[in-house]
UniProtKB/Swiss-Prot annotation:
Phenotype for C283A: Wild-type exonuclease and DNA unwinding, reduced endonuclease activity
Organism (species): Saccharolobus solfataricus (strain ATCC 35092 / DSM 1617 / JCM 11322 / P2)
pH dependence: Optimum pH is 7-9.
Species lineage: Archaea, Thermoproteota, Thermoprotei, Sulfolobales, Sulfolobaceae
Protein's UniProt name: CRISPR-associated exonuclease Csa1
UniProt keywords, alphabetically: 4Fe-4S, Antiviral defense, Exonuclease, Hydrolase, Iron, Iron-sulfur, Manganese, Metal-binding, Nuclease
Family as reported in the entry's similarity comment: Belongs to the CRISPR-associated protein Csa1 family.
Names of the cofactor(s): Mn(2+); Co(2+); [4Fe-4S] cluster
MF terms (GO), sorted A to Z: 4 iron, 4 sulfur cluster binding; metal ion binding; single-stranded DNA 3'-5' DNA exonuclease activity; single-stranded DNA 5'-3' DNA exonuclease activity; single-stranded DNA endodeoxyribonuclease activity
Designated gene of the protein: csa1
GO BP, sorted A to Z: defense response to virus
Assembly notes: Homodimer.
Record-listed [4Fe-4S] cluster binding positions: C52, C279, C283, C289
Nuclease among keywords: yes
Co-factor note (free text): Mn(2+) required for nuclease activity. Can also utilize Co(2+) and to a lesser extent Mg(2+) or Ni(2+). Binds 1 [4Fe-4S] cluster per subunit. Not required for nuclease activity, since mutation of the Cys residues leads to a colorless but active protein.
InterPro entries in UniProt: CRISPR-ass_Csa1, PDDEXK-like_dom_sf
Length: 291
């Protein structure tokens, strides 16, 4: 998730070696034709379709239930927030400072973090600092590398070389019956979508990549053949990444569309799909389903 120019080149080489055989009927730009087309006027959020195997959380939300936000969800939200703010700060400082180098960037990032620290609890601050320093170290070194290789770069070109991706990339999902979306990271040069997860692996995380790919295809009419799924763990000492390149295959696209149709059906008809057999205690609605 902390992409550099070298990372981008390695991913590009991997992608070139993999097959890209996607049925045109399953491209997002075919949103006006089945199976991508949806008759429903309801818009469903991709994030609401990844936690419950029966999608009962969608039903409960329609009925007005509010789930409990547990520790794991809060920690995941913190990591996502610090990640997005940190990457944005790197870009902002490069844009705002002429002839900035890695050492200056480290100083500025340190000052920026301590201005954020006042809004965090002590435990949150520990994990946030580890992640913030991780981001700072990577892109301070990358800034020095780019400056040593290129001269007379515009600030915009410098930013694009140091941080070659967007965070919280907005996507309009309305043509697919989805809400407005935000992709954790988007590398336009490849193109590649990336999602950061902080819990354990779920197959539905791969399905969500298919949803984002379809939505981008519907809006921009460019093919998205791969996604990057990264499980990020932040401890008190380090940041660990476990990332996997995911082909956005026909089967993955079809499964996502089936899941979307089911979610919309639940929203439109208000039919309870029943309690899942694989409920997890950290689910927001666990106490609703298991009082």
């Amino acid at each position: 998730m902390f992409f550099t120019h070298s990372d981008m080149l390695l991913l590009s080489k991997r992608i070139k070696k993999l097959p890209k055989n996607v049925d045109e009927e399953l491209r997002g730009w075919n949103w006006s034709e089945p199976p991508v087309y949806t008759r429903s006027l309801s818009q469903v959020s991709i994030s609401e379709m990844v936690y419950c195997s029966t999608l009962r959380n969608v039903y409960l939300k329609v009925k007005g239930f509010r789930g409990e936000i547990g520790r794991q969800i809060l920690q995941g939200s913190l990591i996502h927030t610090i990640y997005a703010i940190g990457i944005e700060a790197i870009k902002r400082f490069i844009y705002s400072r002429e002839s900035i180098d890695g050492s200056t960037l480290r100083t500025l990032m340190g000052d920026e973090f301590y201005s954020l620290l006042k809004d965090l609890r002590e435990e949150e601050g520990i994990y946030a600092k580890v992640l913030w320093d991780h981001i700072t170290n990577i892109y301070s070194a990358e800034l020095d590398r780019v400056r040593s290789k290129f001269t007379n770069l515009t600030r915009d070109s410098l930013v694009s070389q140091v941080v070659p991706f967007y965070v919280e990339f907005p996507v309009d999902g309305s043509l697919l019956g989805l809400t407005n979306l935000r992709v954790d990271a988007f590398i336009p040069h490849l193109p590649l979508i990336a999602e950061m997860k902080t819990g354990k692996y779920r197959y539905t995380h791969e399905l969500s990549l298919a949803g984002y790919a379809l939505a981008i295809e519907s809006q921009y009419e460019i093919p998205i053949d791969f996604g990057y799924l990264c499980y990020v763990t932040v401890t008190e000492k380090e940041v660990k990444n476990n990332c996997k390149l995911i082909p956005i295959s026909d089967s993955l696209r079809s499964e996502f569309l089936d899941m979307r149709d089911k979610a919309q059906d639940i929203m439109d008809k208000g039919v309870d799909p029943g309690i899942a057999k694989d409920c997890e205690s950290d689910c927001m609605f666990y106490k609703v389903c298991h009082p």
